[in-house]
Amino acid sequence: MSSIKRIGPSRLSPTRSRSVVHNGVVTTVATSSTKVPSLYEQSRDALSAVERQLQEAGTEKSRILMVMIYITEIDNKPEFNRAWDEWVDRTNLPLRACVGAALEGNDLVELVVTASIEA
């Protein structure tokens, strides 16, 4: 049986992991640590958190397989896209999906990311 590595706890809760690694794949969740009322700014911060968490797990954004994006106002998706376009590795484009969702507190965006660790 292959082992599961849990990295954490999350900065939001001592009962959640920041990332989980299993079978050469890491899954991580990120929100913005700044709760400014700008989807663009929160997205930039959350994407930076993703990058840090991937590095902590032993991988990088060029190895991302899939990003599930949750935003509070789907009509503001172009703001997320602007942050994404500035951040994404254009030579290794991952799959992504974006849905509107009710999020906790002042969060405007939440990202669920899976990435490969093994080459």
Q: What is each PLM-predicted segment?
A:
Residues 1-65, 71-119:
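N-terminal presequence-like segments and the immediate start of the first folded domain
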